[in-house]
Amino acid sequence: MRFTFTSRCLALFLLLNHPTPILPAFSNQTYPTIEPKPFLYVVGRKKMMDAQYKCYDRMQQLPAYQGEGPYCNRTWDGWLCWDDTPAGVLSYQFCPDYFPDFDPSEKVTKYCDEKGVWFKHPENNRTWSNYTMCNAFTPEKLKNAYVLYYLAIVGHSLSIFTLVISLGIFVFFRSLGCQRVTLHKNMFLTYILNSMIIIIHLVEVVPNGELVRRDPVSCKILHFFHQYMMACNYFWMLCEGIYLHTLIVVAVFTEKQRLRWYYLLGWGFPLVPTTIHAITRAVYFNDNCWLSVETHLLYIIHGPVMAALVVNFFFLLNIVRVLVTKMRETHEAESHMYLKAVKATMILVPLLGIQFVVFPWRPSNKMLGKIYDYVMHSLIHFQGFFVATIYCFCNNEVQTTVKRQWAQFKIQWNQRWGRRPSNRSARAAAAAAEAGDIPIYICHQELRNEPANNQGEESAEIIPLNIIEQESSA
């Protein structure tokens, strides 16, 4: 049961953690499954038959051996194809991916002895290829799988907790309301829903081997909603990138943008690839609970997601270019200018989600690969926590608004219960309660005396960052 539990964790991790699992580096990294699903048996057998057909075709097409001295004849050993090999040579290939517990990054060896005969195992005197390394590191991978499994649960739980608090702050404090905060709230909601679905999947589906074997429609529906929310997550990131790019680069500082197009892109468009994927998956690759990543049909969803990330990457580059240009115009010291640029970039990176574009390939080295796994899993599973921290808890306007509300609450509490605060604390509380002390960071608040026909609308964001100055109309 331990092997079954962990193997499904690993299969799910491949599906959840990478924008596209068909990249070359990802295809060379599979994890052990001791109790594979029947559908995957069919897939593995088909791969083996295709490899056998290609091997016999290759053996017929290759010319005769041109070397001197004894050699071992080309052969199919049942799993892999071996070319003519000179005597005394140890040949090797990467492990096949027919079996879920085989690691294709490891190597298979086959020895041709000095007489030109393939090595035979002493126990049965039959030709033998050494496949022992293909699953030699299973215990180490199991231990690593458990760590990554619980890291995912902790990360998504912490993300839900912090995002709910952040969302509550943005909803409760109406003074923070503006178009950019509206985009924040929608993106926060996608993070919350996606993390909830992932936790349900990890807790209820992954360790439940009987449920996966029964393959109910409910687990596929859960998978559908996970894929949909994952796509919504990245497309709301794209909405944030488009909005920031419009404000900073296009410089539409004084006009309110039409948010309905953002709603259509963030919530509506992901339904298209997700629905197409579900239909084609049910017809062409209907594996149990749709846990397998051994299908190119995932490109239907991951292709648009990767496109959104690439677009956001170029948005980030252009935004940073504009920010650096603006900061140069302020004639500040060079070191301070680049410090601001780095700070602005580090704030925008988790928002635009470009870590998959900057570091999309897993290193083949074991140690570097393990470091990569932990770094990428931390970025992925704790991304909601990072976003909530950067865009809510560390935001100056949010901090000032919360402090002002807390100061007002303390004044009301003291007045109600008859406790008289000291003159120093009273002056500090009164100063914190001043509405004009709110720094411009999230959005530039318009004047309070708005026209009557604009009442109830959200104020447009005029200046998204302190370092951006409104250009004079010319």
Swiss-Prot record:
Listed GO CC annotations: acrosomal vesicle; amylin receptor complex 1; amylin receptor complex 2; amylin receptor complex 3; axon; cilium; plasma membrane
Organism of provenance: Homo sapiens
Topological domains annotated Extracellular: 25-146, 203-219, 281-296, 360-367
Effect in UniProt of substituting L447P: Probable protective factor against osteoporosis
Segments passing through the bilayer: 147-169, 182-202, 220-242, 260-280, 297-320, 341-359, 368-394
Membrane topology qualifier: Multi-pass membrane protein
Record bears the keyword ATP-binding: no
Covalent S-S links between cysteines: C55-C81, C72-C112, C95-C134, C219-C289
Activity regulation remarks: Sensitive to cholera toxin.
Entry keyword Lipid metabolism: no
Keyword line: Cell membrane, Disulfide bond, G-protein coupled receptor, Glycoprotein, Membrane, Receptor, Signal, Transducer, Transmembrane, Transmembrane helix
Domain of life: Eukaryota
Spans within the Cytoplasmic topological domain: 170-181, 243-259, 321-340, 395-474
MF GO annotations: amylin receptor activity; amyloid-beta binding; calcitonin binding; calcitonin family receptor activity; calcitonin gene-related peptide receptor activity; calcitonin receptor activity
Name of this protein: Calcitonin receptor
Annotated InterPro entries: GPCR_2, GPCR_2-like_7TM, GPCR_2_calcitonin_rcpt, GPCR_2_calcitonin_rcpt_fam, GPCR_2_extracell_dom_sf, GPCR_2_extracellular_dom, GPCR_2_secretin-like, GPCR_2_secretin-like_CS
Alphabetical list of SUPFAM superfamilies matching this protein: Family A G protein-coupled receptor-like, Hormone receptor domain
Function: G protein-coupled receptor activated by ligand peptides amylin (IAPP), calcitonin (CT/CALCA) and calcitonin gene-related peptide type 1 (CGRP1/CALCA). CALCR interacts with receptor-activity-modifying proteins RAMP1, 2 and 3 to form receptor complexes AMYR1, 2 and 3, respectively. IAPP, CT and CGRP1 activate CALCR and AMYRs with distinct modes of receptor activation resulting in specific phenotypes. Ligand binding causes a conformation change that triggers signaling via guanine nucleotide-binding proteins (G proteins) and modulates the activity of downstream effectors.
Subunit structure: Heterodimer of CALCR and RAMP1, RAMP2 or RAMP3; the receptor complexes function as AMYR1, AMYR2 and AMYR3 receptors, respectively, and respond to amylin/IAPP, calcitonin/CT and CGRP1 ligands. Interacts with GPRASP2.
Gene responsible for this protein: CALCR
Subcellular location: Cell membrane
Lineage: Eukaryota, Metazoa, Chordata, Craniata, Vertebrata
